A protein has these predicted regions:
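Acidic, metal-coordinating catalytic segment for phosphate/diphosphate chemistry
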Residues: 1-11
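Charged phosphate-binding loop/patch that engages nucleotide di/tri-phosphates or the phosphate backbone
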Residues: 122-146
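C-terminal lobe/hinge of AMP-binding adenylation domains
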Residues: 26-27
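Unchanged
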Residues: 37-124
Length: 146
């Protein structure tokens, strides 16, 4: 019988001063910035660190915890359960977003609430849980302009 390794991670649902939401594009899917907690690191601190590393921005504030999600995957034949703690965050800057290429992130982008439909069509079930907790499905989606 295989054992299960539990990994704790944290991430953020970042909103800028225009009310737009921050997403990353990795492995051909839209995602939220998140990552594994370092040894001895608190969940809130880890969430901020991951957002800043993966997106190249400095978070201005961190708010309440949104939710906790779970997903499983296999790594070298071992089953891994990833438990992720999600936090609301704010960003007031106007700096250029910088994807963390070494983590496989190819794009970082702000989305208006009405454009979240584009994310829904190409994301992971656990991210859908976070979006639902943030009540981002309430407005009729507007088509993305190129």
């Amino acid at each position: 019988m295989n054992s299960i390794t539990v990994i704790d991670a944290a991430g953020g649902m970042v909103v800028n001063s225009k009310g737009e939401y921050l997403f990353i594009y990795r492995n051909k899917k839209w995602d939220l910035p998140k990552g594994k907690l370092e040894k001895g690191e608190g969940k809130r601190e880890g969430a901020v660190r991951e957002v800043e590393e993966e997106c190249g921005i400095a978070v201005n504030n961190i708010g309440a915890r949104v939710c906790k999600t779970y997903h499983t995957y296999t790594n070298k034949g071992e089953i891994v359960l990833k438990r992720t703690y999600w936090y609301q965050m704010g960003y007031k800057g106007t700096g250029k977003l910088k994807p963390q290429k070494e983590e496989g992130i190819t794009s970082v982008r702000w989305f208006q609430k009405g454009h979240i439909d584009a994310i829904i069509k190409n994301t992971f079930p656990s991210i859908m849980d976070v979006l639902a907790k943030m009540d981002l499905f309430t407005e009729k989606p507007v088509p993305l302009s190129e």
